């Protein structure tokens, strides 16, 4: 699934012309460059900087900690669950 398709599912406009093929979902610690992950709380914030996930659903407050691509979400866990239905 393309990153642009994930933005469409979330009802958001993609902020840049950056495109990535997301082939799966995984945890912050295990995700690779073509996988989507999420961070939904302070307990997981420590893993944001070291995560290799290609894109991470994250609240605005922690977006600057994502090294690859941050997708801003008011409820990262719920959005991740909704997107998982397409994988």
PLM regions with names:
Residues 1-87:
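Terminal amphipathic alpha-helical/low-complexity segments used for targeting or macromolecular assembly
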């Amino acid at each position: 699934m393309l990153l642009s398709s994930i933005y469409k599912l979330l009802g958001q406009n993609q902020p840049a012309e950056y495109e990535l093929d997301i082939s799966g979902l995984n945890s912050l610690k295990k995700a690779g460059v073509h996988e989507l992950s999420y961070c939904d709380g302070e307990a997981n914030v420590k893993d944001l900087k070291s995560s290799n996930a290609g894109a991470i659903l994250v609240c605005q407050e922690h977006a600057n900690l994502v090294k690859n691509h941050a997708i801003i979400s008011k409820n990262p866990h719920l959005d991740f669950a909704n997107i998982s239905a397409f994988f």
